[in-house]
Amino acid sequence: MTPHPILVPDTSVLLKWVLDSEAEEDRDRALELREDWLAGRCEIVLPSLWFFEVGNILGMKQPALAKQLMQVLLDYRIDEAPPAEFCRKALELMKTYKVTFYDAAYHALAITRSGRMITADHGYFRKTSRAGHVEVLKNWSSQSLRGRI
């Protein structure tokens, strides 16, 4: 049995887990990713800064529901990587591709763990795809996981 693939969903994907809206493009794929993780077909790990970015967006987009939605995500108890594991690589990605540290942190973690960052941010993907280890949510499929276990 091969090890489970490591996926690093960024904030754009995590928000689709809790924002129940028709406007959330590719929400079905984000939910499929979550279900694969819950079924044990993959591992999910996040940079320890994830909740700052998610909390900020929830507080701005859904102030009345922000606490409740954040608690849903916290209750998943997703594995978190300490900053020392991804900081240097994130800074390299920032410099090379002119992206934010927040976005680069997810990507750097995917690189250091030999996994894949999954993002719904097409702009980030276009800028950084040459670095590898990043996939746009729209193209992600759980079929790639089922063949590995």
Give the role of each language-model region.
Residues 1-6, 51, 76-80, 107-149:
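Acidic, PIN/NYN-like endoribonuclease modules and their adjacent C-terminal/linker elements
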Residues 1-46, 58-68, 140-148:
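Short, well-structured N-terminal submotif of metal-dependent ribonuclease cores
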Residues 9, 45-46, 101-104, 119:
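Short beta-strand scaffold positions
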Residues 13-14, 53-57, 72, 89:
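A general alpha-helix detector
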Residues 46-50, 86, 106:
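Short, conserved alpha-helical segments within structured domains
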Residues 56-60, 111-112:
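Short glycine/serine- and small hydrophobic-enriched flexible loop segments
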Residues 68-96:
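Acidic catalytic patch
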